Amino acid sequence: MTGPERAAPAVDPSVVVVDLSVVVPAYNEEQRLGPTLDAITAYLGDNEGRFGDWEIIVADDGSDDGTREVVTSRSLDNPRVQLVTSPRNRGKGNALRLGVAASRGRRVLVTDADLAAPIEELEKLDKELGEGRAAAIGSRAAPGATIESHQHPVRELLGRAGNFLIRKAAVPGIRDTQCGFKLFDGDRAREAFAASRINGWGIDVEVLQHFRRADWDVAEVPVRWSHQSGSKVRPLDYARVLTELARLRARSLRPVDVLVPLLFLLMSVALYSGRFFDPNHRYLEDSLQDQNQWEWFFAVTADNVAHLHNPFFSNLQGFPDGVNLMANTVMLGLSVPFAPLTLLAGPAVSLSVCMALGLAATAAAWYWLIVKRVVRQRAAAFVGASLAAFAPPMVSHANAHPNFVILFMIPLIIDRALRLCAGTRVVRDGVLLGLMAAYQIFLGEEPLLLASMGMVLFAASYGVLNRDVVRASWRPLLKGLGIAALVCAPIILIPLWYQFVGPQSYKSVLHGDNAGNSPLALLSFAERSLMAGDEIRANSLSLNPTEQNAFYGWPLVALAFAIVVRLWEHALVKALAFTAIAAAILSMGPKIRIPLTDTIYPGPWALLAHKPLFESVIEGRVAMICAPALGMLVALAVERLAATRELGTQYVGLLAVCLALLPLVPAPLKAVDRAAVPAFFTDGTYKSYVRAGESLVPLPLADPGAAEALHWQTAAHLGFKMPGGYFNGPYGADRIGIYGASPRYTSNMLRDVRYTGVLPTIGKNWQAQAKADFAYWHAGALVVAPQPNDDKLRTAVEKLVGKPGKWVDGVWVWDLHEGS
């Protein structure tokens, strides 16, 4: 779309305006400049009927060869050839500013001194400008371009990479910004170049950015191009262009768009403040045993990366059977990139940094999507994104589940799917969507499944309301999704095969009949609500503190209802409302119990509960879909209120928003001092008790209820293997997924002793069973650390082994090599 008509700037009456100015930047071009000037003057002289009066301005950038003399000699023969000079070499950008500022043309052609694009190509550019464009730029990458002589392959590769970065960071949609052959409307060119600040090669990008911001139409025109020897582009110039791109990108950002991510980071750090500043010695109490588990995941991934081991499997816990890491949420998409930090600072630091940054990045991604797709008002988008990322369910999972907190890819996937509906660049968008989906699978499969459910709910409702949109978008959408699947499949095929068929894979994980949300949970407040939290009530309405998947509070529900009623005429509002309501109902599970009654109704989740993939989902988590939907509804309301001129309406409306959101503001997550790791592990004493192929057996075995032994293992730099643990693995012939290792008689008995303090009668049968279990575990030594009922535990182990343990560096040890 062409920009609005602009009045021409005031022109000095003494200055003669010409039809075309040709600006040639030059630095030490003594050898190439003469033929270039001859070719241009000859062509323009032969085509004055088409191009009218013309001038050539050579902008010398402090050359120290005979460049100026070449221009001076041509000026004597043809006064239309002029020279402007810079006292010293400052770069192409400086030269172009000088040359364009000195121009008088209604149109300005900028061409490189090597004339790699022949002057005859001017006719193509002139035709585009004649159709109302503000600029026509020659392109080597546009369809129809001809490359008659290629650059060196390395230089060509660097150029393509540079153009890709430029498209992503500065001027999306333009394939080639660096072809030195561009025709501009004269007045607009002088304005854009005068506003430029870059002295280097990045000025082309800066000027095109100026045209974009001014909404001036730019056409990319395929041209003939031939590489010329003697290029002034040096290897370091590519690095300088990257620096200039970074400057342009930073300059194009609004201050608020820089401030908002910083605010999100501060909010995230505040939430994690109890652990963030000393992660090695602090523990998130409400994470139960998940912090131990996730630190182990990060540690074992880093170890696999460092030693080039299989990233999908480990036998460090669950020994000897091991753990299918791909079937557990190890988040290879982050635990692998964070491996250097894990190896350097330890898994506690790495996990803490990852979760704080990931939560902030997720909020920033929702902010970006809301600004791009929902509202333009930044404050409204900030409020909506804050709710989407810091809603009570997200805060609950922030205790323990980084895969449900670090969701920055979800807004990007949503945006890319919406681009497919537009149908403009289906192949490109399909490829990118496939890559994004593949990466999200390595961040978390269940969040991707839930996000897909939310997108389907939204698309279905929006499609019913906008049949024309469906008719226009279904073909490119299906084509793009097909391309995405073709791109994604080869990347994830082997990992998913390993997950579902590989060692220690399982069919599904059963969560019981109480995993759905009560309707009361949707209206109540979460435990960590700073102003309205009620620990007893929240725990009574949820599985545990890490699974408070609803708890939006009745004020927000009431506000959302009011927003939907007030803005009902908008299809977007209706679709968001349907998405939130449908997700809330699905989250109640296959059976919905009406509060305060014994009445139970079948829920729609029953249709999905036993389907593949869905059977392993904790259905209460479906309510997390409500968070971004509610965030967008609130953002729409805040934008509407900010724009109204009725102060009473604005005041009452914004007050209602504040009253609905303030009860949801979370208190920092609870953190406590971490129990010290016994010196037996940290000092390496354990090494003298465990031989190659053997395991060290902490008793009772680590399990989902007590996984401190995983912390001991990471503190010992994964120096020993152990049975038991906290992971998802198979059980029985049906390979049903369970939490922890398959139970054995000895481990079950010792666990009962630990929790009840009741010691069973231990005779020859128990001793024989223990001997078989120790052999199965390849046990080299048994360890009992100080813990509740440890005296009863020691007695039980002594009777099983037939000898007392030894107190060694903070633990009791039974060396099974000593004839037991």
Question: Which residues does each predicted region cover?
Answer:
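Hydrophobic helical membrane-anchoring modules
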Residues: 1-17, 171, 195-256
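A conserved acidic beta->alpha catalytic loop
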Residues: 60-69, 115
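Acceptor/aglycone-binding surface of glycosyltransferases and processive sugar-polymer synthases
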Residues: 86-102, 107-110, 119-201, 227-236
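Membrane-embedded helix bundles of polyisoprenyl
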Residues: 264-267, 355-373, 378-465, 480-495, ...
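Membrane-interface coil-to-helix junctions
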Residues: 267-362, 391-407, 516-540, 594-606, ...
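Periplasmic/ER-lumenal interhelical loops and adjacent helix-loop junctions
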Residues: 288-304, 477-480, 484-564, 606, ...
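Membrane-interface helix-loop-helix junctions at transmembrane boundaries of multi-pass membrane enzymes
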Residues: 467-479, 560-602, 644-650
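Extracytoplasmic
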Residues: 511, 658-820
